[in-house]
């Protein structure tokens, strides 16, 4: 039986006999003495096999190669001074192997060397295909351990300190398409009927509040059939929570306690409380996004009122058409950013146009506050407008002013993107800094131009601000998102718990009462049986762990992730199924593979 994990052996174990299991990370032969780095999920310890001191283990030690699986029994010894290795936790000790048992070898050539630093350069496709080897690597093993530690901290805080109950909700449920596409599962028992995999446990957790389970949580698997990005997967994990009889203020306070507990448990970092807050309106005005990275100070300035009557039609026309003109003032930007970068073909021009802008207007502030820009701007701004621009933006000599003009959404998207890119390039962002921020008072609805209707910004079960009930179309939501260094890690709201208000919200997004009862009748009926006021939040576990681990993709903190084509390279899922299975389900595929042209 194992007595220790590799990384847990220290100088306090000297002279003890230990039993270890693991993989051969490296094997070295130094003048007849064989050294083996033994690895398990915790780390590495050095094993020594000496033909004089440990003759019984030596013949097997000679045969070992990378990734062989072994059991080792040996005595812990102090390393000689010249062999000390301060780079690893076990660098003070080594184990003289009295017995080595080969449990399994490697029968094929390794696709990459697990222990080599070059494994970091291996293509991700190869790593995902041989994920069981990839997960042996130190970086990946640490990511999984961190994920476990985060979940453990969540459970301890919610259960031990806040009296939450962990309750599982169904994976097979009904399709209620609102937002992303559902993954559908045909029912063999009920031909022609379909289950859907849940996009979230939203409705069931609200029903649990009706049931009297007033503090619920779940580490929930969720499924969304949507286009993938670096921080999206078709199946993902949430910490899902719901609470009855709590105000928005109380929910935010409880969740700040949770997040602080996680950071202390896994990073030994004390976060200051309370977390700063910004309304959605203020966030969009200052940063152009509801997920601002507040680790650096560049902010947007609205100058629409100053330039609305200017002779420069790009500015005045934008305001006339109901849009905005905003500025990103960049201290020291004159020395860092060239005209080539801003003009067509430049990298910053491309960043802006990728976000929907037609281009970037600019003004450089020179000595004595002289303005350097293209003639069309310089000649069509009055001296008063120029003075007002400098005063409003606080610009001084050396500043570069980047302008966005057009519809408000495009201006915000393009300038917020430029703000982040420039902040990174000018090294304004401290990678060690942790800024957590609540965004509150979201709009209830946004306009869907394609479908020509309002749709819920979060979801249609979000409670409107009570002061806005008379005009739901423009109402603010009692909703809140938690943003960590510019990434949304959690979002929630108070919920509607009165049937009449829920019916009005459905009507506002274009659902008739008949449609609403067909899709959500079970929820509306439950509201007639004494539903308590309640609210909740869900955290993206994958995204949170990614940020804590310093990774750039959630695929590196998930044991067996999908690719950006929603496929598993290890198991080759998704895959076709035989016609017998389809026949049992009374399902027929109409897909016809495209014939490749010669």
Swiss-Prot record:
ATP binds at residues 224-226, 233, 488, 540-543. InterPro entries: Aa-tRNA-synt_II, aa-tRNA-synth_II, aa-tRNA-synth_II/BPL/LPL, Asp-tRNA-ligase_1, Asp-tRNA-ligase_1_N, Asp/Asn-tRNA-synth_IIb, AspRS_core, GAD-like_sf. One of its GO terms (molecular function) is nucleic acid binding. Its EC number is 6.1.1.23. It catalyses: tRNA(Asx) + L-aspartate + ATP = L-aspartyl-tRNA(Asx) + AMP + diphosphate. Keywords: Aminoacyl-tRNA synthetase, ATP-binding, Cytoplasm, Ligase, Nucleotide-binding, Protein biosynthesis. The record marks 30 as: Important for tRNA non-discrimination. GO terms for cellular component: cytoplasm. L-aspartate binds at residues 178, 224, 458, 495. It is found in: Cytoplasm. Pfam families: GAD, tRNA-synt_2, tRNA_anti-codon. PANTHER family: ASPARTATE--TRNA LIGASE, MITOCHONDRIAL (PTHR22594:SF5), ASPARTYL/LYSYL-TRNA SYNTHETASE (PTHR22594). Belongs to the class-II aminoacyl-tRNA synthetase family. Type 1 subfamily. NCBIfam families: aspS_bact (TIGR00459), PRK00476.1 (NF001750). Homodimer. This is Aspartate--tRNA(Asp/Asn) ligase. It comes from Crocosphaera subtropica (strain ATCC 51142 / BH68) (Cyanothece sp. (strain ATCC 51142)). The lineage of its organism: Bacteria, Bacillati, Cyanobacteriota, Cyanophyceae, Oscillatoriophycideae. The gene is aspS.
């Amino acid at each position: 039986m194992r007595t220790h994990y590799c990384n847990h052996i220290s100088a306090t174990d000297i002279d003890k006999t230990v039993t270890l299991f693991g993989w051969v990370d490296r094997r070295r032969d130094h003048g007849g003495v064989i050294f083996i780095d033994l690895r398990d999920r915790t780390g590495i310890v050095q094993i020594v096999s000496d033909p004089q001191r440990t003759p019984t283990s030596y013949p097997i030690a000679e045969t070992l190669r990378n990734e062989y699986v072994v059991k080792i029994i040996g005595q812990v010894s102090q390393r000689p001074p010249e062999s000390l290795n301060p780079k690893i936790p076990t660098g003070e000790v080594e184990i003289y192997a009295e017995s080595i048992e080969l449990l399994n070898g490697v029968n094929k050539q390794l696709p990459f060397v697990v222990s080599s630093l070059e494994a970091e350069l291996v293509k991700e496709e190869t790593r995902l295909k041989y994920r069981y080897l990839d997960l042996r690597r130190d970086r990946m093993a640490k990511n999984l351990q961190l994920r476990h530690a985060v979940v453990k901290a969540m459970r301890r805080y919610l259960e031990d300190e806040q009296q939450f109950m962990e309750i599982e909700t169904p994976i097979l449920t009904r399709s209620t398409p609102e937002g992303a596409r559902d993954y559908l599962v045909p029912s063999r028992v009920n031909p022609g009927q379909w289950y859907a995999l849940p996009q979230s446990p939203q409705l069931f957790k609200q029903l649990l509040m009706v049931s009297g389970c007033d503090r619920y949580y779940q580490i929930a698997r969720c499924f969304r059939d949507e286009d993938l990005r670096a921080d999206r997967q078709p199946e993902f994990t949430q910490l899902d929570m719901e609470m009855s009889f709590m105000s928005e203020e109380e929910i935010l306070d409880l969740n700040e306690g949770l997040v602080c507990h996680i950071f202390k448990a896994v990073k030994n970092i004390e976060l200051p409380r309370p977390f700063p807050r910004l309304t959605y309106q203020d966030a969009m005005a200052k940063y152009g996004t509801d997920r601002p990275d507040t680790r650096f100070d560049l902010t947007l300035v609205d100058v629409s009122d100053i330039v609305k009557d200017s002779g420069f039609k790009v500015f005045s026309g934008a305001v006339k058409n109901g849009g905005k003109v905003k500025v990103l003032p960049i201290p020291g930007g004159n020395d860092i950013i060239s005209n080539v970068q801003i003009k067509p073909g430049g990298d910053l021009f491309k960043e802006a146009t990728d976000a929907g802008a037609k281009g970037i207007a600019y003004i450089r502030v020179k000595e004595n506050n002289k303005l350097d820009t293209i003639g069309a701007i310089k000649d069509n701004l009055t001296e008063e407008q120029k003075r007002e621009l400098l005063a409003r933006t606080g610009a001084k000599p050396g500043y570069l002013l980047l302008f966005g003009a057009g519809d408000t959404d495009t201006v915000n998207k393009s300038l917020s993107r430029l703000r982040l890119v420039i902040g990174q390039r000018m090294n304004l962002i401290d990678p060690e800094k942790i800024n957590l921020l609540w965004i509150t008072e979201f709009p209830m609805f946004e306009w869907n131009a394609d479908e020509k209707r309002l749709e819920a910004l979060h979801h249609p079960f979000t409670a409107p601000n009570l002061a806005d009930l008379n005009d739901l179309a423009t109402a603010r939501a009692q909703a809140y998102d938690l943003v960590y260094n510019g990434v949304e890690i959690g979002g929630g709201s108070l919920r509607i718990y009165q049937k009449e208000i829920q019916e009005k919200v459905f009507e506002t997004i274009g659902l008739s009462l008949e449609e609403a009862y067909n899709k959500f009748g079970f929820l509306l009926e439950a509201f007639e049986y004494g539903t308590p006021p309640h609210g909740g939040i869900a955290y993206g576990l994958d995204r949170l762990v990614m940020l804590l681990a310093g990774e750039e993709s959630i695929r590196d903190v998930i044991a067996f992730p999908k690719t950006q084509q929603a496929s598993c390279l290890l198991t080759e899922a998704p895959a076709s199924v035989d016609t017998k299975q389809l026949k049992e389900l009374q399902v027929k595929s109409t897909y016809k593979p495209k014939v490749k042209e010669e």
